[in-house]
Each structure stands twice: as C-alpha cells, then as structure tokens.
C-alpha cells in the first residue's frame, strides 16, 4: 500500500491532475454502471483523488468521488462525495453510508460539480456503489445535463 503526503497525492498536479469539467461542454456523455474488480477505476466505483477547491487557487483535499462515465480520450467523469448534510438541496443526491467512510457517516454526491479524472490521478481504495444508488445519481445527471 502506498503512503501519500499532501504533495504526492494522485490527481494533485501535473498531466494527471484532477480538474473541473464544464458539464455542458463535455459533449455527449453516456453514464454507465460497470464496476469490475480488476484494479482499475471504473464507472460505478468510488475512488479517492485530489479534488481542487472551487476557488481553484491551488488548494484542495484528498476525497472520495463517484466515477460516472468513461470519456473517449481515456479520462473519466466523476462527482465528489461529502459527509456534510445536504438534505433538500437539489444539487446533492443522498447515497447513505458505505466503506468509503471509515466513520460510517452518510454521504451526499454533488451533481453540480463535475470532475475530470485520469486513471493515474486516482487511487483505488474504496468500493463499487450498488446499482440502485448509482441510478439515483445517474437520474439526477440526466435531469440536469441530459446525459444518458
């Protein structure tokens, strides 16, 4: 198992840095549920990566994200998770708890902010989200952006 510091967390910098993507400019997106226990991140899986703060000032945080789509160029689209409560907020989808949070706290997915990830910019230390909860997120992405 690798040990990471704030300086070498996958996705923080360089060509494999995690970046924010404009959901209306990414073109046609086909979300898919295809987790596979193959050591690679796949749509439907929760992985960890460096997520830049929205201020885009170089700061950020290593956090879990849900991979929702694979892009033709080999990158992935994902949405970030938070344990901060967002009940009643349409930009967030409640997905409950899972092994991605060692404290067992409930989580919410932010469908308002789309992240572009690179395979080498992620570390795979979480799990596959079950299809039912993934479909809740997929439905909200479809409503919001027309993604299939």
Where are the regions a protein language model picked out?
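Compact nucleic-acid interaction/catalytic patches
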Residues: 55-62, 67-101
């Amino acid at each position: 198992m690798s040990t990471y510091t704030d300086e070498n967390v996958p996705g923080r910098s360089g060509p494999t840095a995690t970046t924010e993507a404009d959901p209306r400019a990414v073109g046609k997106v086909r979300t898919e549920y295809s987790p596979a226990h193959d050591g690679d991140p796949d749509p439907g899986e929760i992985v960890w990566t460096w997520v830049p703060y929205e201020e885009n000032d170089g700061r950020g945080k290593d956090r879990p994200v849900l991979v929702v789509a694979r892009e033709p160029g080999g990158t992935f689209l994902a949405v970030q998770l938070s344990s901060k409560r967002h009940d009643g907020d349409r930009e967030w989808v409640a997905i409950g708890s899972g092994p991605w949070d060692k404290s067992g706290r409930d989580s919410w997915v932010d469908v308002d902010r789309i992240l572009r990830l690179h395979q080498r910019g992620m570390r795979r230390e979480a799990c596959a989200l079950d299809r039912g909860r993934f479909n809740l997120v997929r439905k909200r992405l479809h409503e919001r952006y027309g993604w299939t």
